[in-house]
């Protein structure tokens, strides 16, 4: 279990470094990143009167 905890910490740091690199490598995705994507969804939901 201790190994898993250490791996989680390392994975988190690697993810933070990979995040900005991923959108640049994947043009089909949002180049702004997942954070911007979430904001977009929130705005769309607020603007949608059906929702």
Swiss-Prot record:
It comes from Human immunodeficiency virus type 1 group M subtype B (isolate JH32). The transactivation domain mediates the interaction with CCNT1, GCN5L2, and MDM2. Belongs to the lentiviruses Tat family. Residues 1-25 have a biased composition (Polar residues). Residues 1-51 are annotated as: Disordered. HIV-1 lineages are divided in three main groups, M (for Major), O (for Outlier), and N (for New, or Non-M, Non-O). The vast majority of strains found worldwide belong to the group M. Group O seems to be endemic to and largely confined to Cameroon and neighboring countries in West Central Africa, where these viruses represent a small minority of HIV-1 strains. The group N is represented by a limited number of isolates from Cameroonian persons. The group M is further subdivided in 9 clades or subtypes (A to D, F to H, J and K). Keywords: Acetylation, Activator, AIDS, Apoptosis, Host cytoplasm, Host nucleus, Host-virus interaction, Isopeptide bond, Metal-binding, Methylation, Phosphoprotein, RNA-binding, Secreted, Transcription, Transcription regulation, Ubl conjugation, Zinc. Transcriptional activator that increases RNA Pol II processivity, thereby increasing the level of full-length viral transcripts. Recognizes a hairpin structure at the 5'-LTR of the nascent viral mRNAs referred to as the transactivation responsive RNA element (TAR) and recruits the cyclin T1-CDK9 complex (P-TEFb complex) that will in turn hyperphosphorylate the RNA polymerase II to allow efficient elongation. The CDK9 component of P-TEFb and other Tat-activated kinases hyperphosphorylate the C-terminus of RNA Pol II that becomes stabilized and much more processive. Extracellular circulating Tat can be endocytosed by surrounding uninfected cells via the binding to several surface receptors such as CD26, CXCR4, heparan sulfate proteoglycans (HSPG) or LDLR. Neurons are rarely infected, but they internalize Tat via their LDLR. Endosomal low pH allows Tat to cross the endosome membrane to enter the cytosol and eventually further translocate into the nucleus, thereby inducing severe cell dysfunctions ranging from cell activation to cell death. GO terms for molecular function: metal ion binding; RNA binding. There is a cross-link at residue 21 (Glycyl lysine isopeptide (Lys-Gly) (interchain with G-Cter in ubiquitin)). Its main location: host cell. It is found in: Host nucleus, Host nucleolus; Host cytoplasm; Secreted. This is Protein Tat. Residues 33-43 have a biased composition (Basic and acidic residues). Interacts with host CCNT1. Associates with the P-TEFb complex composed at least of Tat, P-TEFb (CDK9 and CCNT1), TAR RNA, RNA Pol II. Recruits the HATs CREBBP, TAF1/TFIID, EP300, PCAF and GCN5L2. Interacts with host KAT5/Tip60; this interaction targets the latter to degradation. Interacts with the host deacetylase SIRT1. Interacts with host capping enzyme RNGTT; this interaction stimulates RNGTT. Binds to host KDR, and to the host integrins ITGAV/ITGB3 and ITGA5/ITGB1. Interacts with host KPNB1/importin beta-1 without previous binding to KPNA1/importin alpha-1. Interacts with EIF2AK2. A motif (Cell attachment site) lies at residues 28-30. One of its GO terms (cellular component) is extracellular region. Acetylation by EP300, CREBBP, GCN5L2/GCN5 and PCAF regulates the transactivation activity of Tat. Phosphorylated by EIF2AK2 on serine and threonine residues adjacent to the basic region important for TAR RNA binding and function. Phosphorylation of Tat by EIF2AK2 is dependent on the prior activation of EIF2AK2 by dsRNA.
């Amino acid at each position: 279990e201790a190994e898993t905890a250490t791996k989680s910490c390392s994975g988190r740091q690697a993810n933070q470094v990979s995040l900005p690199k991923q959108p640049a490598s994947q043009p089909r995705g949002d180049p702004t990143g997942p954070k911007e994507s979430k904001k977009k969804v929130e705005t769309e939901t607020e603007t949608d009167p059906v929702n």
